[in-house]
Structures are given as structure tokens and as C-alpha cells.
Amino acid sequence: AYSIEAEVVVMDDASTDLDIVKRNRSINDLEFCRVIESEENIGIAKNRNHLADVAKGDYLLFLDADVYPVSLDFLKKYIDNRVDDGVLCGGMTFRLDGPVKMSPLRYLYGMKYEVKQPQFISLNFFLPASVFQKVRFNESFSKYGHEDTQFGADLQNAGYKVLKIDNPVYHDNGDTSEQFVIKTRVAIDNLVEHRDLLLPTSRLLQLYEKLHALPIGWLMKIPFKKFRQRMEKNLLGDSPSLFIYNVYRLSYLCCKYEEYER
């Protein structure tokens, strides 16, 4: 048998659904588990920092609410591979037969880009509490999106390792395609707002900079301005195109830049 001393701390970021609040509070009835209720929505970055502040252990494992460990020895893998000078990222995968129905666009995007995990993703990572406290999440990221990208960059800039190991979770994301598209735009809003910080690590921003330098770079605004409805019809359908999704993202980014530069 494998025995460890651990606690589970859950953050409820001002849920408005009373059924969810009730279910979350039942966590307090479980041994070594507790839930913290925020009076207002403070955002992902502040949430993670607060969880780290109240946690009692020497190591921290961060998991999003919509993930589930793939392996039965999930915790053991992290403990056996722990490092004192960095963070372990276990990665993610997706399943079509999970407890929630994934939208075609969300599943397609996740399998194409997120499973490969080209950069730090915060839904499943493990690190010493001391390392976290020296870096912490940048709380200027109050909106959805890219706070994890910046945290990963801050870790590396501080000299810490970001190591990937094979210890995935199922990401049972229940967003509809429409919700995912809305989140995409919100994340791009955040990307543009923090463009000076994120330019070194964001491929989308780097691509924009290259196109913007060209005489015909302004043409990339046209797809979102002229064909937004057609593109969204494809993205919300049963057979979405990732090519159209990427054009949608880039074109929206170009339009947002135009707004910020006015």
C-alpha cells in the first residue's frame, strides 16, 4: 500500500448556481478536504495564488475542476518524479465517453493542440510550494486566458525547470461550441491587453507582428469583419474546420489590435 499525507482544498469562485454551491459545500464532510467560498469572482490567477497561500503541504498539485486522473497511481507518479527546482506538468487527454458531452470544436481543438502540450498548461501541474511562492501567478490577468502561459514563462525566467511527464488527466470540458468560441475571443482580448508580456511566448502574437509588418497585413482584418457569421456557422456545426478556427482567431486578433491602437 502507498500512504501519503495530503489535503484537498477546493476554491468556489463565487458560484451563483445554488445547486453547485450545495454540492461544493458537501466537500467539507470528507476527511482531509475543505472548500473555500469566495464572496466575489476574483479570477483564475488570484484563485490559484490564494489556494497556494492556504495550503499546508510542502508540495502543491493544481487540478482544474473538470479534470479526472487517468492513472490509479496518479499521485505516486508525481511524488516519485518530484523535483525541488521546477514544476512537473502531467498533461491531458480527452474522451468521448466521459461524463459530459464534448462539443465537436472543443474536442477537435483539444486533440490537435492541447494534448501535445507545446507550452505550460495549468490544469494539471505539481511543484514545491516554495517554488510557487517565489513566482506566483500574475494577478493582472483578471480575465480568462493566458495566465498560465505567463506563469510558465515566469518560472523559466526565474531559472526553474518546466518538465513534462506522462501523467495525464481527462479534460472533461462541457463547454458548447458557442461557449468555446466566446472564450476564444475573451482570451484574445486578454492576449492583446497583455501583449508586451506575452509576445515572447505567444505564437499568435508573433504571427500577427510578422503579418502587420507586411504591406498587405491589413487584409487579415477582413475575415472577421466580413465573414464572421459564416465562420461561426461552421465552428458551431457538427464538422468544424480548425483552419477556419485559426483564421477566425487571427482575424479577431487583428481587429482587437486596431481597437487598442486608436
Regions found by a protein language model. Give the residues of each.
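Glycine-rich, basic loop-to-helix element that forms the pyrophosphate-binding segment
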Residues: 38-55
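Non-catalytic, C-terminal membrane-associated alpha-helical segments of glycosyltransferases
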Residues: 186-189, 203-262
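Conserved donor NDP-sugar-binding/catalytic core segment of glycosyltransferases
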Residues: 68-101
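Acidic donor-binding segment of Leloir-type glycosyltransferases
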Residues: 1-37
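Short aromatic/hydrophobic "clamp" motif used to bind/position activated sugar donors
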Residues: 60
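Active-site donor/metal-binding and catalytic loop motifs
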Residues: 163-195
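A recurrent flexible, glycine/aromatic-enriched loop bordering the glycosyltransferase active site
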Residues: 110-127, 142-144
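Acidic donor-binding loop at a coil-to-helix junction in glycosyltransferase catalytic cores
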Residues: 144-151
